[in-house]
Amino acid sequence: MTKQTDLEDRMWSRGFDRRQRNINNNLSKGTESETDYARTMIKAGLLPFVEAIQQFLDRAWRGTPGVKATAAIKLHEFKDVDVIAFITFKGVIDGASQKKTATQAALQVGHMLEDEQRFTLFEQQDKKHFTNVKQHISDTNHQRYRRNMMMGHMRNRGFVFKSWSKEDKLKVGLKLIDIMISAVGMVKLSTVRSGKQTKTYVEFTQVTMDWIKRQRKNRLACYPLYEPCVEQPIDWTSTTEGGFHTKRLRHIKAIKSKDLTYHEEVTKKEPTALYTALNCLQQTKWEINTTVLDIAQSCWDRGIEVGCLIDAEPLPQTPKPYDIDTNEDSRSWWRREEVLRHDQNAHDRMKRYQCIMLLDTATKFAEEPFWHVTQADFTGRIYYVSGIFNPQGNDLARSLHRFAEGAAITDEKAKNWLGIAGANSWGMSKYSYEERIEWSKTEGEALARQIASNPESYISIWSKAEEPWQFLAWCLDFNELLEQGYGYVSKHPVLLDGTNNGFQHFAAMSLDDNLAAKVNLKNYDQVEDLYEDVKDQVIKELRNLSYEQCLAEDWYKHHELITRKMIKKPVMMIPYSGKTFGIASAVRDYFVSSDEELSWDKDCFLHNHYLAKIIEKSVNNISPKCITVMQYLADIARCFGQEDKNISWITPSNFYVKQQYYNFNMKRIRTKLHTSTVKLSLLTDTKEVDKRKSTQSFAANFVHSLDAANVHLALTKSKASG
């Protein structure tokens, strides 16, 4: 067994171990219903369970008036029987898993349904506030915290809900368990006598229990934790041959698609440029920048936050005021601070996990060179397989990567390009090349010498960079060049970002000279900035309209907040078929996540939608041909839809793209509080084209495919030139 095959075996084993930890964690918390195999059980039994509940309700409410069963009265108040069935299924699975009595399981089901009804009422009475709260708690799966937050906001808003009695919860729960046993048969009631006492438990049937035991140990259900390779990946020679070395990881294809027919079609077209691009990236040998790793680990250990590296420890409990027991104001203040603390810790949990994964993976590969496996999506865009630790990752992930085989800097031209890399990571990417080169010779050189002399003493300086960790890596490398002079072998990657690629492609497709200049397709010395131009146009529009429209007046009063940073994402969305609603959501998300103060609610749809329309209008004023091209692409998609055909095309790199969106009957069941959902696919084998989705997606996918073709051809040319 080679070192690489051993590594791939461990990737697989770690994926299995992770799944086992998740299962054991759910079992210990009493939430086995959140496991992958439990979701399979729910999907299998939900439809007959829904039908049985509906039949019970129909019988109860059919015929002569009279006293209805408590369960029927309570369940009749729910609009969606699917939700009743889903919640019951989860409660019963958790009850059987924990060996609860029928009474305990029934009360749990009743309690969960009561919460569903309570929060449905909250949504009906104040949908805007409910939506904000649910979005706020969306990044944590801690059920008690989610419920407490929702309950707290209901109390603060003065909502009153008549709680179910314990008797009502029990009757509803027992009836639903009875229906589930009759209609689905995965569970049963088992009576156990102990002395003079008799208890009835909810249990899985023997067939179900045997199946669960097999699923808990099912290695095929686990997802490997993909990592870099210590041996060069196998070159791609077809869409199914290449990448990892061992068979158990060879399910990773050159193109991320489960459609084997599509793989065959692509292979027949012989996409040589795609294979060359994938292999060129896979053949790139990397090594860990151990100096950056040591500093990052030191910051992590000492609790110093820099850029995307956050504090290793969650925020501690807020100290209680000395008069908390006697002073209501102090008590309220402390509770508010604790809510904010819990919120921040919940938001930081995933970021903290990513930091740990980055540092651990970098430490693991710190002593030898490594490679990354690559694959493409159906539009041809290329990605690294290995999770968050790759050269496309965040600032820290990129800074930890450097070339294992460097290149000597032998003249001023090469030195200038390295200087431009430093200026970019410092935050000068929109300045001209001449300005960036001049900066590197003056301020950049001084910063590199100072920071490299003692990086940890000057954290307060390099942490101010736009990309602090990459800037630190640059300072270390540039200082070596200054110390050693020409002939120094640099391993620092020089990253060059495209200037709004989407609009570049629209400029090329429409032969729009004006737009081409604004996205730097013209050979001008001065760097243009489309985002800055759109920002200026938006402010101009708001000023002109502020005399006659209240919303324009509101926004113009805050025009200093309409910055390049704020405008960037909404503008980027437009060439990829971004609609007004989506652009308005991007505006909302920006201001909600910022500390900027507005004189209206940041969630105000009217204000956000209005600014989105102004942004669209401004882009159209700058480049009216963009709308023409998008409409033309939409017309093409509609023609295919009328003939019930998928759209396919060949990109300039000879890559075959096939857009496949089919109609199928699917229902997604969502609850008001709980994080899990389930999709029910009733007719998954239909081949009827989803005309609406095909039309909406075509322009974006077409532009993405041109982006990808550019990468394929550029890497092919680079490979050919050595």
What are these regions (language model features)?
Residues 1-571, 575-708, 713, 717-721:
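Non-catalytic nucleic-acid-binding interfaces of large nucleic-acid enzymes and RNP effectors
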